[in-house]
């Protein structure tokens, strides 16, 4: 497979023939060229007369050992939770907590081991509030678990370890997101730790410096990576917002400058001005819990955690992508990467949503059996990984959706990759799909949704989105009904509407193409 990935299976025999005909002079020339001091790893072998060895005893009497063994008390296996849309909606306890104003959605169910998953989203501010704030929001969230007024970072880690729980934070301009993974017994303790981190953080300069160093090092290591650079350039070509806007996408130099500008003073100021509940917060808890305890806890502990910044979503409306096909040269990189983006003016609530999702799966969603993977990986044998995906906007106003294609390959195969994408797009648009492809995609999509709803963390995310967009599980049920009713003709019509020839995409190729 390595030779196929390099371009052709017959390279294996060419390699064999070359090895057979190699001369001493050629080997010595290669030594001089490649075995240079800066490309060596040296180790020393120090022999000893009496090496110390470790002997592992072979166990005997295994049958007798296990014959009388009695295990621990059996763990509660939990209930067989029905992930049918109607059942989820019927089990969902939702509403708004009167004192804190938090919108909630709880599913109290008997989980194996009495596990529970919690997600808490706080939204505040508008686009003007977050102008010229750079990357500060992300740094504030990253520092929340690094220490509080009464707990050090180690204290927090020890306390969570003692109750076998985890607490995580993430944030961006306009949003801070907290999550807890725990058990019914330890959820109250985990909530106290999360609350302490969220309401009483202690921003330490040494912890800030560590995060800045890590992120700068990450940028430095990615500065010559074909995939990183190609994605960066694709986004910059389609830059919509001016510098300073929360949705502005900076280049690497600008990202470095933004990171270096972050200070403890900026962190504290951002926290003081934007952390707290204004008029938009949502709480989703799924698993084994005392519902009344959770409601009372958030009422008692977050009614005074206020922000005076009413929330207004930072809009990111649709704009047609720029048609381009650019190369980025990354010397000495064995892998090359191509990514393409095509904008699509549609949203989750549009009638084309179901067919467009299925079209995306057929074109590039499967690991080995999609159009893109079959052509570039199996038929041409030129890609280590190739595919496509459709990203459909949830916002009914922005309608900022897009289609993505990508491939990883050896630089020598760059032209073949371009030809493959070009021809497969043309064939997809002109000829459409088959009934067999449709049936396979429908079954895969429905099974995937069923599995996703059986995972508490993914179900939590789904319910959080429903709360935010003021909808319930009937939205997902309706989408599945639309997917199930799709025909070849409906999908083909959507393909012709949204898929375009390669020359209309924003395509960026990164690799050592010299």
Kindly give the residue locations of the regions a language model identified.
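Peptidyl-prolyl cis-trans isomerase
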Residues: 25-26, 30, 200-203, 208-209, ...
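Zinc-dependent metallopeptidase catalytic helix centered on the HExxH motif
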Residues: 353-354
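Proteolytic maturation boundary segments
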Residues: 13-123, 130, 282-330, 336, ...
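M16 family metallopeptidases and their MPP-like homologs
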Residues: 1-21, 41-46, 111-200, 212-220, ...
């Amino acid at each position: 497979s390595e030779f196929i990935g390099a371009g052709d299976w017959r390279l294996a025999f060419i390699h064999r023939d070359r090895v057979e005909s190699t001369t001493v002079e050629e080997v010595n020339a290669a030594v001089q060229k490649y075995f240079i001091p800066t490309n060596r790893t040296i180790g020393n072998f120090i022999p000893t007369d009496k090496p110390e060895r470790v002997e592992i005893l072979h166990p005997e009497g295994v049958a007798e050992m296990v014959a009388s063994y009695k295990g621990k008390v059996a763990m509660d296996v939990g209930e067989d939770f029905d992930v049918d849309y109607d059942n989820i909606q019927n089990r969902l306890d939702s509403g708004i907590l009167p004192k804190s104003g938090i919108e909630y959605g709880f599913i109290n169910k008997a989980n194996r081991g009495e596990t529970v998953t919690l997600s808490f989203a706080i939204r505040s501010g508008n686009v003007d509030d977050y102008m010229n704030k750079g990357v500060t929001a992300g740094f504030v969230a990253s520092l929340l678990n690094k220490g509080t007024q009464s707990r050090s970072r180690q204290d927090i880690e020890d306390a969570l370890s003692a109750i076998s729980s985890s607490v995580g934070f993430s944030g961006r301009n306009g949003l801070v997101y907290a999550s807890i993974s725990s058990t019914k017994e330890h959820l109250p303790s985990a909530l106290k730790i999360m609350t302490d981190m969220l309401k009483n953080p202690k921003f330490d300069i040494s912890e800030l410096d560590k995060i800045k160093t890590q992120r700068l090092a990450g940028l430095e290591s990615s500065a010559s990576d074909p995939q990183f650079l190609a994605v960066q350039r694709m986004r910059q070509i389609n830059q919509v917002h001016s510098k300073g806007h929360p949705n502005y996408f900076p280049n690497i130099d600008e990202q470095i400058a933004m990171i270096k500008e972050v200070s403890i003073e900026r962190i504290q100021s951002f926290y003081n001005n934007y952390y707290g509940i204004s008029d938009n917060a949502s709480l989703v808890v799924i698993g084994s819990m005392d519902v009344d305890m959770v409601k009372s806890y958030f009422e008692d502990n977050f009614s005074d955690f206020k922000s005076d910044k009413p929330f207004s979503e930072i809009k990111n409306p649709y704009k047609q992508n720029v048609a381009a096909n650019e190369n980025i040269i990354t010397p000495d990189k064995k892998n090359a990467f191509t990514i393409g983006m095509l904008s699509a003016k549609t949203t989750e609530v549009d009638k084309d949503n179901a067919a467009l999702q299925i079209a995306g799966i057929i074109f590039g969603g499967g690991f080995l059996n999609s159009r893109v993977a079959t052509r570039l990986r199996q038929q041409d044998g030129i890609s280590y990984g190739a595919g496509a995906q459709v990203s459909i906007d949830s916002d009914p106003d922005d309608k900022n959706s897009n289609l993505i294609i990508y491939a990883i390959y050896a630089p020598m195969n760059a032209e073949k990759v371009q030809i493959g994408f070009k021809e497969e797009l043309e064939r997809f648009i002109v000829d459409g799909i088959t009934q067999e492809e449709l049936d396979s995609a429908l079954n895969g999509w429905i099974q995937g949704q069923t599995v996703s709803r059986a995972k508490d963390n993914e179900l939590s995310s789904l319910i959080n989105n429903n709360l935010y967009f003021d909808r319930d599980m009937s939205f997902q049920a309706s989408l599945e009904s639309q997917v199930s009713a799709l025909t070849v003709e409906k999908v083909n019509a959507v393909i012709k509407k949204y898929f375009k020839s390669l020359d209309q995409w924003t395509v960026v190729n990164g690799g050592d193409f010299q």
